[in-house]
Structures are given as C-alpha cells and as structure tokens.
Amino acid sequence: MHPAPTDTRPRRSSPWLSALLLAILVGAVGGLVAWGLAGVPSGSNTADPGEGADFGPSRIVVDTPQLRAAKDEAGIEPCAPGPGTEPAEDGLPSLVLPCLGGGAGVDVASLRGPMVVNLWAEWCPPCARELPIYADFHDAHGDRVPVLGVNWSDPKPVAAIRMLGEHGATYPQLADTEVALSSPLRVRGMPVLVLIDADGAIAYNRAVEITSLEQLEGLVREHLGVEL
C-alpha cells in the first residue's frame, strides 16, 4: 500500500483573507495616527497648526509698504525691546523676532513682566474669537501689565493686520515667521497664552482660548501676583 502523494504546490491565499488582512493593517495605522493626534497637549478649542514645527525656511515677509500702511490704519503700536540685557532663568531664549508690519525687531529674551504674551494666527478661529478680550485687557490694564502679540507663521500677514484692526487690538505685534518659538514653548496648537513675570521667567504657558476678560484677569492674578 502506497502512501497518498503529498501536494507540494504552494497554496494560494484566499482573496477574502487578503482583504481582511489589508483592512486590519489600515485600521491599525489609522488608530496610531488618531492616537498621536489625541495625545497632543493643548487647551480647549485650540487650532492644530498642521505639520508641526518643521516648516522649513520661511518665505513670509512682514515688512512691506502695504503692510506698513495696513499697520498704520489699524493703529497698532510700535514694537519695543524689554529692559533685560541677557536671557532670564526659565525665560524666553535669545531670539530676535521681526515686528509685524515694519519696525525694529525685538530680542524676546529682553522681555520682562508682568507681561501677557499671546501667540495667534489669522487662520485660527479661536484666535479671532479671543482677540477682542486681549484688546479689552490692553485698554484696561496695559499700563500695568503690557500685552504683546506674536503672529505665528502666518502666510497672510496683511490679513492678520486687518484682523487686528477689526477687533481693536492695537498692542504691539511681533512675527514668528520661522516658528522659532515652537520648540522652547512646546507649541502644539493656537492660540497660546504666555505670562512673563518681573524677572523674565515664564510663569504660565498653555495653548488655550481665553473666553472672557475675567478669565484672563484671573490668570494674571494667579500666576503673576498682580491685583487688577
């Protein structure tokens, strides 16, 4: 009695099995992507900046005759350096940012508080919603706690300046065209609120939408010790 011959031909995989494996693979990749996005730390109602910090060399120009005219029309105040002569411990790095709409650049390491710094962008809906609140804070408390805006990697600087004018935000504005603050401030979304104390140290840094003047006043009181 001879044993039954063994079939040595390679078995073909079933089409439905291949499709099932492909679906599992796609689902796993999608899950990892979703997990990564969900793990981004930010405050409520913040806008994702897109591809993160690696934008490559910037081609954004923030000083042209058109931008200077728009800045004058919006009534935006000129940029001014802070009193610091060297970077503060736990403060901003030595980094010169240009003034949005023309004017002298500022080394952010020179900034001393108490000061409110708002990173924002024209493409960010939460930023537009909170701009009037920063404008109100500037009008009410700017003599004691100055407000400084930092326009973050905005491809349309003229639209950004016009948006400031529409919301009455006249406080000085720097421009981070190279997203240079992305790493030191760990920027993961817009808008961002940074509070700087009298020594130049960062007392508060969070991606968060400010929804009321009282909220902003409370944060300044809590983290900078200023009674408003």
What annotation goes with each model-predicted range?
Residues V96, G149-N151, V194:
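Soluble periplasmic/extracytoplasmic beta-strand elements of cell-envelope proteins
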Residues M1-S94:
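N-terminal targeting signals for export/organelle localization
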Residues P15, R162-A169, D176-L228:
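Thiol/disulfide oxidoreductase modules built on the thioredoxin-like
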Residues A128-H167, T177-S183:
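Structural microenvironment flanking redox-active thiols in thiol-disulfide oxidoreductases
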Residues G84-E89, S94-M115:
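A short beta-strand-turn-helix
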Residues G105-A128, Y134, V147:
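Short active-site neighborhood of thiol/selenol oxidoreductases, capturing the structured segment around
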Residues G113, R144-V145, T170-Y171:
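A generic structural signal for alpha->beta connector loops
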Residues I76-G82, P98-L100, P125-A128:
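Sequence contexts marking disulfide-bonded cysteines in secreted/extracellular proteins
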